[in-house]
Amino acid sequence: MTGRAHAMFATASFPRAFAAARSSGRARGPVAVRHERASAVVAVASSGRTSSRKSVRPSAISAPLADASVASRAGGGEGKGPVPALRELRDAIPKECFEPDTRESLKYAAIDLGLLAACFGVVSPAVVAHPWLLPLYAPLTGTVMWMNFVIGHDCGHGSFSNDKALNAVVGHVTHAPLLVPFWPWAYSHKQHHRFHNHETKDMSHPWMTPERYEATNPLVRFLALDHWWGAFLGFPGYLLLEARETSTDGSHFYPGSRLFDRAPKDERVKCAVSAATCVGFLGLTFAATDSLAHWAMQYLAPYLCFSWWLFAVTYLQHHDEDTETYAEGEWEYVLGGLQTIDREFGFGVDEATHHITDCHVAHHMFSDMPHYRLEKATAAVRGVLEPRGLYKRRDTRDFVAKTFALHDAVGHCVERDRPRATKAEIQAWITGESSD
């Protein structure tokens, strides 16, 4: 194996896919065949060098776009390759997109927190009296919880306001009802942005090599990786579990977690504070309900729906049949970011959930923009990327079915058998300099 990876698409299920990997020394699927056709464009020799600059094509570009004409059009005449420099993307975005409006942010927070209070305080007692309402109440309240998560998500990035204290307060208020420790999650999430689609440094959904999959606890594989119910159980497991064999990034509730091994010392203290707010809210949910059965109806059911939303949205943003990941020697920030996908969920979902679904490419490149600026920023980024064939946007109005189908087909597998452009060659495309 070369140590280079991209997400594998296979018709087999997740465990069966890795069974093939064990027997052949690599994981393969239909997309691998398409990528082999693209290798003529990449034209990377076994030595890792290419015969001419025009033949170098960074492997992050998805297979349907991997043709010489795309590479030639993008690089010809202007001295620029198909992959723009980060500065070019940032300069294309109106400056006001990077300026949070605290009053506007507070307005959205008040609306979403008010809706959540209404769901828990007004609607949930009615569910106890009329259990037939549960199939409506659980997904509705879970969606409102997801809306609050996006508000806290802005706080974690510092894009809610320029006031760090206000960001921390609103972040904890919006995250505690979701049992998400605000500061630890903000820390790990920043690593996810910093190293998006890096095979070993990315945080969130694990990128699974055959070796890592085999080293993962079988119970964790059963509960979180291999089956449809992982969409409901994966996120709480990710936050809770500490042991390396769980394939998480470390517990977000435990101040001694390996998550903070390279973090500033105060992150462990902040972890204790954030975890305490979650435990406190969880205690309130038990105190406010009459029995375990009522608690399951009033809180657990919508919580699991929220967990599904978080899994589904983040999974679909970063996984598709042609998604690529990168090992240490070939990863580059813009290349990793270009694997992000803007997905239109439709039915008012994109608007209700603050465009976290359909404006995610711009957000992943520049996380310091508040959610209400993302539409304008997306239009600007799209204007740079789309003419070069680098912008990924999918109509995903079948998002429920798509989540389960894609997870079954793609899982978290990676493939390691295709020649790649080297980091130097990739940088040459970005800067417009020859790699010869």
Label every PLM stretch briefly.
Residues 14-144, 151, 175-301, 308, ...:
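Non-catalytic, topology-defining segments of multipass membrane proteins
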Residues 351-384:
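C-terminal, well-structured subdomains that either form a transmembrane helix-short loop-helix hairpin
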Residues 145-164, 185-199, 313-321, 357-368:
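Acidic (Asp/Glu-rich) catalytic motifs at the cytosolic membrane interface
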Residues 160-179, 202-221, 327-346:
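Juxtamembrane helix-capping/reentrant segments at transmembrane boundaries
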Residues 307, 311-352, 391-396:
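Membrane-interfacial segments at transmembrane helix termini in multi-pass membrane proteins
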Residues 1-18:
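PEST-like, low-complexity acidic/proline-rich intrinsically disordered segments
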Residues 158, 173-177, 364-365, 384:
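Alpha-helix C-capping/helix-to-loop hinge sites
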